[in-house]
């Protein structure tokens, strides 16, 4: 697994976004001597491109400042979580090129969180409430009206402690009681109106089994897990800005650094005891046009079979982007290019595509392929003519070496490279016209062969024998150059032409009554059967090529093999989407 280390990061130009400036100041003032961050996904789905920004920031910051980053599975909602999602998350983080200092689960800390909740009860800072969820919403109030205190808000600490322990013992059914923080029902911040800290949920947990009939709420568990792990800077997106006062309330009132007895369960697990007073810092989330990133909507796309699974190359999951042919380097370049700020904005999808083009232009070997093949027969060559031509694997990188490519009397060319009635400015083949065959010589079309329906099925032509490589006529000027594949040697391949999943910039915009389902791009996937040169077929899955003049393609991660090649188009050679 490739890693982004501190050494790698420091070789890069210094980044000066506001988060890194805060960290530099904290280090300079002695607030912290060692930086610790975390990436805390919930294992209830696959990571998407928005998570890539958080991953690059969390792990990148730690590496740049010589610290470390923890990968924590936020597994507090077992009814929606699955070990398969947890495994995919680890795979995605590794694929992006990052290595976690430790792998943790919020469930590792359930005993500590329970003891912390008992402390809050004893301190008079939490109470057991008998209101159901609908009543809680009613009592909470609105943005313009203060909330009302629960009838059970003034229970004594002893009664609350007894009830909470009964909740822990599994005495009560789901939804009948919650443990709530006692903060301020009149607060202008609704998150501080006595939020729930624990709820009853008799659900088996993937890691703890049936040990726990109660589970901590996100805000409580997240804040204290950061504190338990000694996190110095808890980086999250802007929608959590209003949750920061609650985050600080949990951290400060439990006060783990000064209540080390609460950490005793960590000793049994062999975990370090390095509690901190973490600081939450918010940054803008990643928004890209032509996409949806809501987990609910992505799930609907899969469940309704509008796409072919979570790793469909049209999906914006990291699994899907990887299968499409996006590289870790391109993803990291994209995150670096869009930067880190507090201002929400929508990034044009072309920025992501250009990062991939830039990366693949440097690393992808060149190959020839035809996706809409048309046969060209060079009638002045012998029927058994065969020779091996030498081509560079990359025109700008001699270190990638060369390959041999067979050349024969019958070739496959691209159907779009011939026109009987050419438009103005046409530079490719026409009846009686000439074109250069890449690396092979200059050819002319003498005859257009059609079937009974009038469809063109072949071209017959002539290869100028004086224009072969190394001959003087090879320098003769012609207007166009086209690619080709030797027909007897070509390998048939399935080629999947992927494009953007949605046809409009804002698929989430329902102002015209249409939902994201109504604006799916009908041409987001086309499957064609073409021909590739032999050197392209004999390669492993997830290997990228530039098919000359066609775009960047990758061997499919799951379906490709040498006997039955399958290629996915990762991105076109240039941006073909017209902006409004």
Curated annotation (Swiss-Prot):
Residues reported to bind ATP: 42-44, 48-54, 237, 285-286, 293-295
Catalytic reaction equation(s): tRNA(Gln) + L-glutamine + ATP = L-glutaminyl-tRNA(Gln) + AMP + diphosphate
EC code(s) of this entry: 6.1.1.18
Coiled-coil regions, chain positions: none
Span of the annotated motif 'HIGH' region: 41-51
Entry's family note: Belongs to the class-I aminoacyl-tRNA synthetase family.
UniProt xrefs under Gene3D superfamilies: Glutamyl-trna Synthetase, Domain 2, Glutamyl-tRNA Synthetase, Domain 3, HUPs, Ribosomal Protein L25, Chain P
Annotated positions binding L-glutamine: 74, 218
Name of the protein described by the UniProt record: Glutamine--tRNA ligase
Subcellular location: Cytoplasm
Span(s) of short sequence motif 'KMSKS' region: 292-296
GO biological process, one term: glutamyl-tRNA aminoacylation
Entry GO MF terms: ATP binding; glutamine-tRNA ligase activity
Family annotation (NCBIfam families): glnS, PRK14703.1
GO CC terms: cytosol
Quaternary structure annotation from Swiss-Prot or TrEMBL: Monomer.
InterPro entries registered for this protein in UniProt: aa-tRNA-synth_I_CS, Gln-tRNA-synth, Gln/Glu-tRNA_Ligase, Gln_tRNA_ligase_bac, Glu/Gln-tRNA-synth, Glu/Gln-tRNA-synth_Ib_cat-dom, Glu/Gln-tRNA-synth_Ib_codon-bd, Glu_tRNA_lig_a-bdl
Keywords tagged on the record: Aminoacyl-tRNA synthetase, ATP-binding, Cytoplasm, Ligase, Nucleotide-binding, Protein biosynthesis
Top EC group: ligase
């Amino acid at each position: 697994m490739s890693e982004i280390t501190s050494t790698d990061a420091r070789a890069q130009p210094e980044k000066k976004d506001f988060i890194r400036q805060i960290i530099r100041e904290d280090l300079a003032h002695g607030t912290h001597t060692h930086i610790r961050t975390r990436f805390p996904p919930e294992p209830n789905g696959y990571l998407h491109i928005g998570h890539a920004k958080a991953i690059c920031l969390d792990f990148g910051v730690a590496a740049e400042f010589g610290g470390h980053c923890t990968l924590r599975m936020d597994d507090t909602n077992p009814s929606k979580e699955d070990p398969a999602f947890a495994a995919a998350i680890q795979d995605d983080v590794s694929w992006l090129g990052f290595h976690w200092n430790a792998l943790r689960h919020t469930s590792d800390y359930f005993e500590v969180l329970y003891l912390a909740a008992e402390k809050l009860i004893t301190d008079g800072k939490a109470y057991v409430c008998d209101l159901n969820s609908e009543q809680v919403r009613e009592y909470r109030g609105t943005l313009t009206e203060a909330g009302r205190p629960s009838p059970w808000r003034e229970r004594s600490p002893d009664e609350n402690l007894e009830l909470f322990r009964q909740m822990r013992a599994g005495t009560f059914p789901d939804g009948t009681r919650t443990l709530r923080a006692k903060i301020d029902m009149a607060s202008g911040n609704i998150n501080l109106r006595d939020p729930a800290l624990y709820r009853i949920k008799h659900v088996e947990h993937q890691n703890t089994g049936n040990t726990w009939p109660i589970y901590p709420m996100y805000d409580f568990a997240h804040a204290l897990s950061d504190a338990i792990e000694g996190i110095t800077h808890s980086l999250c997106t802007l929608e959590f800005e209003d949750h920061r006062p609650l985050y600080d309330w949990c951290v400060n009132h439990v006060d783990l650094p000064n209540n080390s007895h609460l950490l005793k369960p960590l000793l049994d697990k062999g975990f370090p005891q390095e509690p901190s007073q973490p600081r939450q810092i918010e940054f803008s989330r990643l928004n890209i046009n032509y996409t949806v990133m809501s987990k609910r909507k992505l799930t609907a796309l899969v469940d309704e079979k509008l796409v072919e699974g979570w790793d469909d190359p049209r999906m914006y999951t990291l699994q899907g982007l990887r299968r499409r042919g996006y590289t870790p380097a391109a993803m990291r370049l994209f995150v670096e290019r869009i930067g880190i700020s507090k201002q929400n904005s929508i990034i044009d999808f072309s920025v992501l595509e250009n990062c991939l083009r830039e990366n693949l232009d440097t690393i992808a070997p060149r190959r020839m392929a035809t996706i809409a093949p048309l046969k060209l027969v060079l009638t002045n060559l012998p029927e058994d003519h065969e020779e091996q031509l030498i081509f560079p694997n990359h025109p700008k990188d001699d270190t990638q070496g060369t390959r041999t490519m067979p050349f024969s009397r019958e070739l496959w060319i691209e159907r779009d490279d011939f026109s009987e009635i050419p438009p103005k400015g046409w530079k490719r083949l026409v009846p009686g016209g000439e074109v250069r065959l890449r690396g092979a010589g200059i050819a002319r079309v003498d005859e257009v062969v059609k079937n009974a329906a009038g469809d063109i099925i072949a071209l017959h032509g002539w290869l100028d024998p004086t224009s072969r490589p190394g001959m003087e006529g090879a320098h003769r000027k012609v207007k166009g150059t086209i690619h080709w594949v030797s027909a007897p040697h070509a390998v048939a391949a399935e080629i999947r032409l992927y494009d953007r999943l949605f046809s409009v910039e804002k698929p989430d915009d329902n102002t015209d009554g249409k939902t994201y389902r109504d604006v799916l791009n009908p041409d987001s996937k086309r499957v064609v059967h073409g021909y590739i040169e032999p050197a392209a077929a004999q390669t492993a899955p997830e290997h990228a090529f530039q098919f000359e003049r066609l775009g960047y393609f990758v061997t499919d991660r799951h379906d490709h093999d040498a006997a039955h090649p399958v290629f996915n188009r990762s991105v076109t050679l240039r941006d073909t989407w017209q902006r409004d």
